[in-house]
Curated annotation (Swiss-Prot):
It comes from Prochlorococcus marinus (strain MIT 9515). GO terms for molecular function: 2-oxoglutarate-dependent dioxygenase activity; iron ion binding; L-ascorbic acid binding. Its EC number is 1.14.11.-. This is PKHD-type hydroxylase P9515_13321. GO terms for biological process: DNA damage response; intracellular iron ion homeostasis. Residues 80-174 form the Fe2OG dioxygenase domain. The lineage of its organism: Bacteria, Bacillati, Cyanobacteriota, Cyanophyceae, Synechococcales. PROSITE patterns: FE2OG_OXY (PS51471).
Length: 221
């Protein structure tokens, strides 16, 4: 499984987050400021100043929500969660087809994530498009929902036709770089935990958990 979609933020967290972000009109600036030389040519959105206190405060909240979530930990095997920023796309804004930088000042980008802070009914257009080798995944998230996907994929955000698209984005440096190896480990972990919940502890399960842990040591970096 290369993608993970999950309801990360509850209604109260969303309400507080949106209320405080919408008060910061003077802190929203051009998104081109953090794009690479190639991506800046196709990036047309706004982002909250990353050095502002409110950006730092809520970036910490997002980081904590991700790192403490058991499902995300099993899927992404996060070593560091970095580059978190809040972005806004108003009418006619978009982010064209691009690839994320492999290395940033804050870490390597193995996985990218987007968290929707607005309901998908609040704006038209603005779909996140992720291109795999043989297909195109186009989606709009429910408010509070996160999608995590490999940073190796080309992706884009379609033009917002009306309304406002408010999201949080960031990157994960994983202990395991390989997409395939992360998928194998995730399946093994999920299967073992499922058997534990259904049948309880056993010597056979101990061996499976041992193999998972030792594979993680072998494949991790």
């Amino acid at each position: 499984m290369n993608f993970l979609t999950y309801k990360l933020l509850n209604l109260e967290e969303l309400k507080i987050l949106k209320l405080n972000l919408n008060k910061q009109n003077e802190l929203w600036e051009s998104g081109k400021m953090t794009a690479g030389s190639q991506a800046s040519k196709v990036k047309e959105n706004l982002q909250l100043n990353r050095n502002s206190e409110i950006s730092k405060k809520y970036s910490q909240l997002i980081r904590k929500k991700i790192i403490t979530n058991p499902l995300i930990k099993s899927f992404a095997l996060p070593k560091t969660i970095h580059g978190i920023m809040f972005t806004k796309s108003l009418q006619n804004m978009h982010y064209g087809r691009h690839i994320d930088n492999p290395f940033m000042s804050s870490g390597r980008s193995d996985l990218s994530f987007t968290i929707s802070l607005t309901n998908k009914a609040d704006y038209q257009g603005g779909e996140l498009v992720i291109e795999t080798l043989n297909s195109e995944k186009k989606l709009k998230l429910d408010a509070g929902e996160i999608i995590i996907y490999p940073s190796t994929y080309l992706h884009s955000v379609k033009k917002v036709k009306n309304g406002e698209r408010l999201v949080c984005v960031g990157w994960i440096e994983s202990y395991v770089k390989s997409i395939e190896e992360r998928e194998y480990l995730f399946d093994l972990d999920a299967g073992a935990k499922g058997l534990l919940a259904k049948y309880g502890r056993s010597d056979e399960l101990d061996n499976i958990f041992k193999s998972y842990s030792n594979l993680l040591r072998l494949l991790g970096n």
